[in-house]
Amino acid sequence: MLSEEIRQLFLEFFEKKGHKILPSASLIPDDPQLMFTVAGMVPFKPIFWGKVDPVYPRVTTCQKCIRTTDIENVGRTPRHHTFFEMLGNFSFGDYFKREAIEWAWEFVTQVLKIPEERLWISVYEEDEEAYDIWRKIGVSSNKIVKLGKEDNFWGPAGPTGPCGPDTEIFYDTGKEVPITDGKEPNPGNTEGRFVEIWNLVFTEYYQDENGQLLPLKRKNIDTGAGLERIAAMMQGVYYNFDTDLFLPIINRITDVLNVEYGRDEKHDVSIRVIADHIRALVFLISDGVFPSNEGRGYILRRILRRAARHGKMLGSEKPFLHNIVDAVVEKMGKIYPEIVEKQSFVKEIIYGEEERFLQNLNKGLDIVDKIVKETGGKIDGEAAFKLYDTYGFPLDILRDLANENGYILDEEGFNKYMEQQRKKAREAAGEVEFSERTDYETLDISTKFVGYDVLSTNARVLKIRTEKFVDEVKDVECELILDETPFYPEKGGQVADKGVIKGKNGEFVVTNVYVPVEGIIVHKGKLKGKIRVGDAIFASVDEKKRKATARNHTATHLLHAALRKVLGTHVRQAGSLVAPERLRFDFTHYAALTKEEIEKIEKMVNEKILEAIDVNTKVMSYDEAIKNGAMALFEEKYGDKVRVVRIRDFSEELCGGTHVKNTGEIGLFKIISESSVSAGVRRIEAITGFASLTYLENLETNWKKIKEELDATDENVFVKIEKLKEGIKQLELKIKEIQKNMINIKQILNNVQIENEIKYLVYEFEGVEQNTLRDLADKLIDRGVDLVVFFNKQGDKVILIVKRKKTFEKLHAGNIAKSLSKILDGGGGGRPDFAQAGGKDVSKINEAKSKLIEILREC
């Protein structure tokens, strides 16, 4: 049975049981505590947590998921994956254990027709109710294994929250494996033989701060069945990679790389890694994740680099992953149309990123070789971090190299350096460590945001948090939750408001505002004085900063629209930062913008500012907004009701941020830089309002200084610059002539040596023009020298020139230059008769000279 049929049968089965079929949610969850959607229940987490009422009491999905915690096992084991599909059925306060168990058994035995003798069950050792249900539907007691909390009890996700026992269905593959306790093999004592195909979680408790389990008013069902595992079971194979979900991709890999699958285990591991990782790459990029050095983008980059390295291990020396994309789309595009829509774009991103990485990989591998030679096979934490930070060399690739070659890798030291860097980045960005905020999910409170209409309001303190929730604080850094607030929290690329919260006995300076869970707005800052839960306060936003941020946010919308009009509709937002001082906008585009394009975009935005257009906002249904032409952004999540920001017929986007009421308030828009973020993603940084005025004033000041230095006017300043350039050019020519005259060919010829019947000459120079040395090398060859090697020091770098007699074919100048430059921590090469290279380590020139003699002796 093919995977398409399994997927369809599952969804249709539960639809007949009264479930609503919902499409897969994005891999980017609407949850600040999660990097990716890691399970089928993630989109329903607010319902399980009691924060949101369900629209449907029963739903069923096939959810695309990403997990990278065990990435080093992918390809080496039968069932580890980064990207996978999870089939699931969910009940929100509707049916419970009996129906969940009966329907799961019915689907497996009657729809999939798996022989009952091949199935085993595990239950939580204290869950007699689940055990009795399994017995009543006919499962014999010797096929039910009672396991402890570690195996059959789910949650909570943090110290507190919903949780409950679970029961699992296992498939017996019949594989002969060792038994841990000497008894009959079962899922509790045997590794590798029994495959878990379905987990049924009964969320019936809430664990409080004391670890006590309290019964939930609304009990829920959360089940998950891995499609890849079920496909392997139905297709009679042990490895998920041998199913129809992977074989078409594996076949494309073997065709592209000209390798065979199934003959060499080491090669097979690499092929399986690539097959798994390319699926993850296609789906992540299609869902709006782009390569970067932080967050989701870093995980994407890590997956891509790992796949690229395994390609290199299979003999690939150039980008190839983009050629595998079509196989993924052909296999899964009918189920997930978003990967068809983004197919070309995904290939562009993958190609560019892989091309860059391969360039750095080769440099990194050379450095690793150098390190292990010098240290006897040890890579310390500082060296590992430098490889990562300077060359983008991932730790998992270093780990693979260490495992393959027996090197000692100091991961603990690397992690210390890495954490130092992350701490600096967090401090610079004011980032909130959401992983430490799980206790906010326990709160049954909410904050009303009033900041669209007012910048100050009276409110009441609902909660105070330091390390934990407290009733009163004095003179500390802490976090406050109010019943209502004018402070806009950091989200959607817009930075949080700053300002002050004043109480009767204290003043709280707000430094950051964020949303740890839906409906709660947290104010982070420093308190001078006292404040208590229940206090009446006055919350006031910094008006100057808010207005500057609003100018930049509306300008970002104008910029987005202008980019699409000038460059094309392929342009999509790929990230943004909207702050009071500036705006940063990342967008999808394949090439650097020309000077003319930048000028055209800037002019278009300023025209809309001068037109003084009203900026309108309206709340409507998501479907209505999209139908009306509003743009939804890649990474943003939207509820049933959305806020649409419209600037006449020029721009219309879904956006929850703060904006000016009229474009005229922006004043002036000025692009200050355009650059590359990653393959296929460009970045524009710009300023507006008073910041652009200050920028222009600085330009004018510098312009006046230039005129003063040149004793010039507006009319003749460029004429004077041209005269200066011409004068410099003439002086450079004179310097070259002087250098030529200073070089004594006869004196240099005294340094000719003979090795292995080869007349060679090695000479060091400092700061000599390269063309002068090339001419000199030609003259020395004409004087009968077989090989000329020049080391030309340029500050802390060195340029290498290698020239040989054209008829002297047993020497190859390009290969010599390549070997010597590697010692000098550089690179280069060239033709058999002439080559040029560079190096960064002038202290290794003598070592390079010794290497040259070795090369000559071996000729």
UniProtKB/Swiss-Prot annotation:
Subcellular localization(s) per the UniProt record: Cytoplasm
Disulfide bonds: none
Record Pfam families: DHHA1, tRNA-synt_2c, tRNA_SAD
Entry superkingdom: Bacteria
Class of the enzyme per the UniProt entry, highest EC level: ligase
Keywords for this protein: Aminoacyl-tRNA synthetase, ATP-binding, Cytoplasm, Ligase, Metal-binding, Nucleotide-binding, Protein biosynthesis, RNA-binding, tRNA-binding, Zinc
Family statement drawn from the similarity comment of this UniProt entry: Belongs to the class-II aminoacyl-tRNA synthetase family.
Domain note: Consists of three domains; the N-terminal catalytic domain, the editing domain and the C-terminal C-Ala domain. The editing domain removes incorrectly charged amino acids, while the C-Ala domain, along with tRNA(Ala), serves as a bridge to cooperatively bring together the editing and aminoacylation centers thus stimulating deacylation of misacylated tRNAs.
Protein name: Alanine--tRNA ligase
Organism: Thermosipho melanesiensis (strain DSM 12029 / CIP 104789 / BI429)
Gene of this entry: alaS
